[in-house]
Amino acid sequence: MGPFCLGCSHRKCYSPIRNLISQETFKFHFKNLRYAIDRKDTFLCYEVTRKDCDSPVSLHHGVFKNKDNIHAEICFLYWFHDKVLKVLSPREEFKITWYMSWSPCFECAEQVLRFLATHHNLSLDIFSSRLYNIRDPENQQNLCRLVQEGAQVAAMDLYEFKKCWKKFVDNGGRRFRPWKKLLTNFRYQDSKLQEILRPCYIPVPSSSSSTLSNICLTKGLPETRFCVERRRVHLLSEEEFYSQFYNQRVKHLCYYHGVKPYLCYQLEQFNGQAPLKGCLLSEKGKQHAEILFLDKIRSMELSQVIITCYLTWSPCPNCAWQLAAFKRDRPDLILHIYTSRLYFHWKRPFQKGLCSLWQSGILVDVMDLPQFTDCWTNFVNPKRPFWPWKGLEIISRRTQRRLHRIKESWGLQDLVNDFGNLQLGPPMS
């Protein structure tokens, strides 16, 4: 069966049951037990935002429950079609986030797939407390297909439970108190989900390798997940490079329009071995590429090495501080970071993060034509020349001046110049 608009195929209108649910309902139905056969109702807490380059604009939020043998996901799709798609411009782009007591069954996943296929202006994130009938091959297949269609599918972690409690529960001003074994059960649900989704991740070229592993953080940004998946690839496609490393002004580039944080790295060792290369991608709502990079380098236990990184965005404060701490613990390591764009460069916490990099001895600079060319040769296509886009060098010089002003405003120009004069090579015998 081909794609079709589910909303247009059904005239009955469904409405959310309410904006808030009781504390008892939430604790009973969203408890992430391994076995919950007595919980047959499905609750779906949703948030709809309009995509904007500066910040998402919240439009609707509420709660759906299965009704008249119609599952909560389908009720939402009917409602969304009538109350959002029919009212607002078809050129608008929307982000939908679901927090579900059960993951979608294979029939609902099929309907969601067809809905997404007919509405390309939507993105969907699905966080579920429990996995529904995970041994059923059809359920597994359709969860994979949701990911391949562009949806994000994940198990609810403590952060999602807290957010759900704050936004969708009549909490009376009380903080969310995790139930016993919440994190243990999350790790179980997450591991089962990763087993299901592992076959459907985008394959990398046959000449490269990919690794899947779990990484656990101690402290980070509020959005940081405790356990996330890592994907490592060696090469980017030409289309990816031109779209992701394009150094245009920020107002024309926003995450919702496909601009993602990439980190390409090359390690040169003093023992004469061939350089090691790789490319890491941050997924929205998950671990940042810089932290994945640190995890990779720590696992290699290197000492004297020169590392060159090419980033689509400069590091956020949390990543910058962790990079700086890593460098301070390894004074013999030389790390040079080139960035295509500066991330929130006008905000002082982000400037302070850049300062921590310089103060630790990390060299931070803006990508110009030589760096774009080197990145292309090493990570895209060494057999074809790099063709710069219009205005590349002009925009690079503007960004370099902006970075220079940040250095001067924090009184670090002399320090940065001293680091820039250091010998980048093996110690003299």
Curated annotation (Swiss-Prot):
It is found in: Cytoplasm. Its main location: cytoplasm. Signal peptide: none annotated. InterPro entries: APOBEC/CMP_deaminase_Zn-bd, APOBEC_Cyt_Deaminase, CMP_dCMP_dom, Cytidine_deaminase-like. CDD domains: cytidine_deaminase. GO terms for molecular function: cytidine deaminase activity; RNA binding; zinc ion binding. Its EC number is 3.5.4.38. Zn(2+) binds at residues 71, 105, 108, 288, 316, 319. It is an enzyme of class 3 (hydrolase). It holds the Pfam family NAD2. Keywords: Antiviral defense, Cytoplasm, Hydrolase, Immunity, Innate immunity, Metal-binding, Repeat, Zinc. The active site is at 73 (proton donor). It catalyses: a 2'-deoxycytidine in single-stranded DNA + H2O + H(+) = a 2'-deoxyuridine in single-stranded DNA + NH4(+). It comes from the Eukaryota. SUPFAM superfamilies: Cytidine deaminase-like. One of its GO terms (cellular component) is cytoplasm. GO terms for biological process: clearance of foreign intracellular DNA; cytidine to uridine editing; defense response to virus; DNA cytosine deamination; hematopoietic progenitor cell differentiation; innate immune response; negative regulation by host of viral genome replication; negative regulation of single stranded viral RNA replication via double stranded DNA intermediate. Probable human APOBEC3G ortholog. The CMP/dCMP deaminase domain 1 confers deoxycytidine deaminase activity, whereas the CMP/dCMP deaminase domain 2 mediates RNA-dependent oligomerization and virion incorporation. DNA deaminase (cytidine deaminase) which acts as an inhibitor of retrovirus replication and retrotransposon mobility via deaminase-dependent and -independent mechanisms. Selectively targets single-stranded DNA and does not deaminate double-stranded DNA or single- or double-stranded RNA. Belongs to the cytidine and deoxycytidylate deaminase family. This is DNA dC->dU-editing enzyme APOBEC3. It comes from Rattus norvegicus (Rat). The gene is Apobec3.
